[in-house]
């Protein structure tokens, strides 16, 4: 039996929910885009029509994040994992090390890839505070004096841990913002490189964004594949080869949708309200638990467990039947996880809390 999509809320960590108006527009335009009689998926990436899409999407992203002129915006392939290799190969220059801040799974994944190209200096920032998971403040991070850059992941999706501050350093700061980009205001000028896989707050999977400061172009090692070379991509307007045009087009629609919501400042307020609704209920409950200290709780990914973990399967089955999708926690930590990215409306979070309250009453 088909579910009414009006009552379905997708809490997937990624690929994540896309704004419904974006999907509706893509559906309407799918077979005949801009009166061309063909789909946007079928036209040349070199055509004037698609060049206009590419240029407008870049400008919209620049507007949303207030990206300074001395930064290049690159639309890349291979997702964030490709950037785990691209970052050291583009930025090391003659250096043999870079500092990596380890606060969770994705930071550790970046370290493992970097080991192929250098000897990463790893600072473990994981901590415990009041019996909860936390992260050491950036002022306590130890940065190697010879580091080519400092890499960190501001939001660890699996544990639901967020880093909210930056170190004071003369080293370029590199951030994997796959799960936080466009969810709150940031000062791009404080970073050397920001990269993000698209499939959470930007668009569908298949594309990634890299925002690179101009002075960091041209440091690439000779062995770096051209498709990962920031300078090559910048010189070729991200079209060194055929890009994932449909994902690029959809990302552009998401940027326009976000501007129509009032931009990043407005969506940040909504995101904070959504997270507060969910965390407040969990904290008030004796049935649900979140193991992250409030100082480091993620705005985007809210993991929670029940005091009766044997009820997990029942919880997930009943939630699914009500249209509350993809709430199963990551296999590493178990339990449940609600990913509440930009496209998740407040109504979805309220529907989840209503279900959680009812489930608690029936099963406590």
Curated annotation (Swiss-Prot):
Enzyme class: transferase
Cofactor, free-text remark: Binds 1 pyridoxal phosphate per subunit.
UniProt keyword Transmembrane, yes or no: no
Obligatory cofactor(s): pyridoxal 5'-phosphate
Protein residues bound to pyridoxal 5'-phosphate: 80-81, 106, 157, 176, 199, 241-242
Metabolic or biological pathway: Amino-acid biosynthesis; L-serine biosynthesis; L-serine from 3-phospho-D-glycerate: step 2/3; Cofactor biosynthesis; pyridoxine 5'-phosphate biosynthesis; pyridoxine 5'-phosphate from D-erythrose 4-phosphate: step 3/5
Domain of life: Bacteria
SUPFAM superfamilies for this protein: PLP-dependent transferases
Keyword Transport: no
Residues noted as binding L-glutamate in the record, renumbered to the chain: 46
EC identifiers of the protein: 2.6.1.52
Location relative to the cell: Cytoplasm
Residues modified to N6-(pyridoxal phosphate)lysine: 200
Keywords of the record: Amino-acid biosynthesis, Aminotransferase, Cytoplasm, Pyridoxal phosphate, Pyridoxine biosynthesis, Serine biosynthesis, Transferase
GO molecular function annotation: O-phospho-L-serine:2-oxoglutarate aminotransferase activity; pyridoxal phosphate binding
GO annotation terms (biological process): L-serine biosynthetic process; pyridoxine biosynthetic process
Catalytic reactions of this protein: O-phospho-L-serine + 2-oxoglutarate = 3-phosphooxypyruvate + L-glutamate; 4-(phosphooxy)-L-threonine + 2-oxoglutarate = (R)-3-hydroxy-2-oxo-4-phosphooxybutanoate + L-glutamate
UniProt record similarity statement: Belongs to the class-V pyridoxal-phosphate-dependent aminotransferase family. SerC subfamily.
Subunit and partners: Homodimer.
Functional summary from the UniProt entry: Catalyzes the reversible conversion of 3-phosphohydroxypyruvate to phosphoserine and of 3-hydroxy-2-oxo-4-phosphonooxybutanoate to phosphohydroxythreonine.
Protein name: Phosphoserine aminotransferase
The organism of origin for this protein: Vibrio vulnificus (strain YJ016)
